[in-house]
Amino acid sequence: MLWSRFIQPRLISLACGSKPFMVQRTKIVPLAEGNVLEIGIGSGLNIPLYDKDLVKKIIGVDPSTEMQSLAKKRINESPVDVELISIDAAEIPLEDQSIDTIVCTYTLCTVPNPQGVLKEMKRVLKPGGKFLFSEHGHAPDESVKKFQYKLEPVWKFLADGCHLTRSIPEILNKSGMKIHTMETMYLPSTPRFVGFNYWGIAINH
């Protein structure tokens, strides 16, 4: 289908690469170190933000081959080795405790089974390893929240399964990883229904 194969991936990459979202990415991605697993690497928007002096290798997981094709230029220009794996993040083909840092930006909103994905993250992340996240989700204001619930069925179709109402702290707390730091705010120049942002660091225990 033309929409899902060509138009939708490019629109999502464009929206997720807008300035407010890129500013949020710069707050967490440079903190990654060692062997890094990026969940939902998509079109590779985070790749230029990694610190080449801290990161040994980036393993990017994404089920969308269309998105991965959009990432090729950034991968080719990266000073850090990037390996792409085309698979659902609920079945990560990596050994237990083999990853130092996991990065996840604007992906927990879309995965069909966030708890299953986080269970896999916890399995492959070393004890004491960092989970760096920046996600949009459930807004605190009642009027915004009501609009999110009304819009969500249509939004999920338009935005490849993206949910507007997921509570990121609740999802993380259920995973067994401990939230070390977390900040929230409405992103500037962004519609409030999609602009309430959670970002921070969780530690694997």
Residue locations for each model-derived region?
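A short glycine-rich, Lys/Arg-flanked "PGG" loop and its adjoining helix->strand segment in the class I
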Residues: 115-127
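A short SAM/SAH-binding and catalytic strip from SAM-dependent methyltransferases
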Residues: 100-113
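Conserved alpha-helix/loop element of class I SAM-dependent methyltransferases that forms part
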Residues: 15-35, 45-49
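Conserved beta-strand signature within the Rossmann-like core of class I S-adenosyl-L-methionine
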Residues: 128-136
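Class I SAM-dependent methyltransferase SAM/SAH-binding core
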Residues: 37-39, 43-91
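Core SAM-dependent methyltransferase catalytic element
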Residues: 177, 184-205
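A short acidic, Gly/Pro-enriched loop at the edge of an enzyme's catalytic core
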Residues: 87-102
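Short alpha-helix
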Residues: 160-176
